[in-house]
Amino acid sequence: MPQITLSAEVQPEQMGQRLDQTLAELFPEYSRSRLKTWIEADLVKLNDRITNIPREKVLGGERIEIIVEVEDETRFEAENIPLNIVYEDDDIIVINKPKDLVVHPGAGNPNGTVLNALLYHYPPIVEVPRAGIVHRLDKDTTGLMVVAKTIPAQTKLVRDLQKRKITREYEAVASGIMTKGGTVDQPMARHATKRTLMAVHPMGKPAVTHYRIMENYRNYTRLRLRLETGRTHQIRVHMAHIAHPLLGDQTYGGRPRPPKNASEDFMEVLRNFKRQALHAVMLRLAHPITGEMMEWYAPLPDDFVELLNALKADYLEHQDELDY
C-alpha cells in the first residue's frame, strides 16, 4: 500500500475539542472512524508527540502529522463500464447511476462498480482517495451522484456534506396511505445482529429525513424526500421505522402489498419491480472550486415510470371504491 503524510495545524477555534473530532474537520476526506483507528494505532503526532487517545483535548496551534498507509486504488481494475455523465469539468463529475450498479468494490463485488468505471473514464482519479467518490447510492437506488476529480475538490465536497450544504432530493414510493408530509429525526447505527443492515438506535449518529406527499394510490404513496444527513440506507430505514417501507425493499420490509381486486397486469408490474422504489432526482451544491451554485435533475428511470403508471391506472380503475 502507498504511504501518505497528512499535516495540518489545529485552529484556534478548535480549542477544547476532542482530537478525533478535530482531525475529522481538518481531513474531511477521511471518515472519523478511520481517523480514530489511526490515532489508536499510534500513527498521529501532536507537536512531534505520539498520541493514541481519541478523546484527548486540543489547545489550538498544535502541529499534526499523520503518516499512514492507505488503500491503493490502483489495485482495482479500470473497466470500460458506460457512465451516464450529466455534467463534467476539470474538478467534478456528476453521474446518473442506473440500478444494479454498486458504487465501490467490496465483498461480493470485487469489480463491475462505479469506481472501476471512473478509473477507466478518467485514469488520474486513481490519485484521489476512493477514486473521488464523495457519497454513495445503494446498488438498486438510481439517480444523481457527484464525484471529485481532484483532492481539493473532494475535500471541499466532503466538508460541505458534513455541514449539510449539499441538497439531495429523492422520489420514492412508500407502502401504505400517507396523508401528510413530515420529518423523521431518528439516529441510526448498525443493526445489533445483522451487521450489514442499519437500524434506528438512540445511541446512533444523527439522521434527518424530510418528506412530502406527491400522490396517493391504493396501498401506496409517492413521496419527495430531502436528506439533511447521509447515513447508509437512511431513507429506507427511516420510512420502515414509521411503518411505510419503500415498495420493493425486501430488506426493510417493503414486500409487495397488492390492493384488493388488482388486475393481473398491475400484479405483473409489481412482481417485476425487484428493487426499492427510490431515485435520487435532484442534486444542488456549490462548485468546490469556483463556488458557483449548480443544480441537476435526473428523470425517473423507465422501470420507475412504468411502476407509477401502473399505480395510477389501478387507482383510477378503483377510485369509486375508495373511502379516502
Swiss-Prot record:
Cellular localisation: Cytoplasm
A GO CC annotation given for this chain: cytoplasm
GO molecular function: 23S rRNA pseudouridine(1911/1915/1917) synthase activity; pseudouridine synthase activity; RNA binding
GO BP terms: enzyme-directed rRNA pseudouridine synthesis
Main location: cytoplasm
Domain S4 RNA-binding: 17-90
This protein's UniProt keywords: Cytoplasm, Isomerase, RNA-binding, rRNA processing
InterPro entries: PsdUridine_synth_cat_dom_sf, PsdUridine_synth_RluA-like_CS, PsdUridine_synth_RluC/D, PsdUridine_synth_RsuA/RluA, RluA_PseudoU_synthase, S4_RNA-bd, S4_RNA-bd_sf
Residues at the active site: D138
Gene3D superfamilies associated with the record: Pseudouridine synthase, RNA-binding S4 domain
Reactions this protein catalyses: uridine(1911/1915/1917) in 23S rRNA = pseudouridine(1911/1915/1917) in 23S rRNA
The protein's Enzyme Commission number: 5.4.99.23
PROSITE patterns linked to this entry: PSI_RLU (PS01129), S4 (PS50889)
Superkingdom of this protein's organism: Bacteria
Function field: Responsible for synthesis of pseudouridine from uracil at positions 1911, 1915 and 1917 in 23S ribosomal RNA.
Sequence similarity: Belongs to the pseudouridine synthase RluA family.
Protein's UniProt name: Ribosomal large subunit pseudouridine synthase D
Annotated organism of origin: Haemophilus influenzae (strain ATCC 51907 / DSM 11121 / KW20 / Rd)
Gene this protein is translated from: rluD
